[in-house]
Amino acid sequence: MSKITSSTLLKFKQEGKKFTALTAYDASFAGAFDSEGIDVLLVGDSLGMVLQGHDDTLPVTVEDIVYHTRCVRRGIKRSLLIADMPFMSYATPEQAMTNATALMQAGANMVKLEGGHWLLETVTKLTERGIPVCAHLGLTPQSVHVFGGFKVQGRDADNAQRIIDEAKAIEAAGAQLLVLECIPAALAKSITEALTIPVIGIGAGADTDGQILVMHDVLGISSGYIPRFSKNYLAQTGEIRSAIRAYIEEVDTGVFPAAEHTFS
């Protein structure tokens, strides 16, 4: 199978073909996900919670992401690999350039940053210098204390319009991909239709171009709180590779996410 690139994802969007993404943190799981056909793998700062046992993603360092990006890169042949830029690793464009360079040198194809209008200069500078950017709007976990917890965003008219405006501005600044997390399905649909770049949803309804989940949720091995938008595919298949194939098939056919996985 041909390698997935940002151009591949753009073609998928233009053709109306849904694509799938998962988090991955090591070579073995990444290799399995890659060989079964997952299009995008994310070395997420979610590792702070699912691997390191923290209550949020804030303690994760650039060095943590670099280490796990190298691990995942060794295990894959086809998937597009995105690396999260952790909390306060891109507070200025200069800091972002230094840290994004380290992640690209570790094997990432793209870096992901959380935030809206304040990120525009950073997004432009990174893309102008050859570092592709995936933006992240809606519930941005690095801002959990600003939000007062992990809460659905964009439910009122003002916040919904802000997210729409930020999505358009980030695309104009040069971002090649956008993640929308925990926003009403109708809002995510509007943004997806308004943008040229592909949009990946997590808790954002079925009308985004792609879907992403945390691998621990897909395999039913998360401890503590289980997000409403997640689905345990291992429980219905009994085998890891079968679970991944079921996830891909349900996204492709529109079965997932269903109404119970979305917000209004």
Swiss-Prot record:
One matching Pfam family, short form?
Answer: Pantoate_transf
Q: Which UniProt keywords apply?
A: Cytoplasm, Magnesium, Metal-binding, Pantothenate biosynthesis, Transferase
The enzyme class is transferase
Subcellular localization: Cytoplasm
Q: How does it assemble?
A: Homodecamer; pentamer of dimers.
State the organism of origin.
Answer: Shewanella loihica (strain ATCC BAA-1088 / PV-4)
Keyword Metal-binding: yes or no?
yes
Cofactors that this protein relies on? Mg(2+)
Quote the protein name from its UniProt record: 3-methyl-2-oxobutanoate hydroxymethyltransferase
What catalytic reaction does the record list? Answer: 3-methyl-2-oxobutanoate + (6R)-5,10-methylene-5,6,7,8-tetrahydrofolate + H2O = 2-dehydropantoate + (6S)-5,6,7,8-tetrahydrofolate
Residue positions annotated to bind Mg(2+) are: D45, D84, E114
Q: Residues that bind 3-methyl-2-oxobutanoate, according to the entry? A: D45, S46, D84, K112
Subcellular location, principal: cytoplasm
Q: How is the cofactor bound?
A: Binds 1 Mg(2+) ion per subunit.
Q: In which pathway does it act?
A: Cofactor biosynthesis; (R)-pantothenate biosynthesis; (R)-pantoate from 3-methyl-2-oxobutanoate: step 1/2
Q: Which SUPFAM superfamilies match?
A: Phosphoenolpyruvate/pyruvate domain
List, alphabetically, the GO terms of the cellular component aspect.
Answer: cytoplasm
GO terms assigned for molecular function:
3-methyl-2-oxobutanoate hydroxymethyltransferase activity; magnesium ion binding
Q: Which InterPro entries match?
A: Pantoate_hydroxy_MeTrfase, Pyrv/PenolPyrv_kinase-like_dom, Pyrv_kinase-like_dom_sf
Active site per the UniProt annotation: E181 (proton acceptor)
Q: Which family does it belong to?
A: Belongs to the PanB family.
Q: Which residues form the signal peptide?
A: none
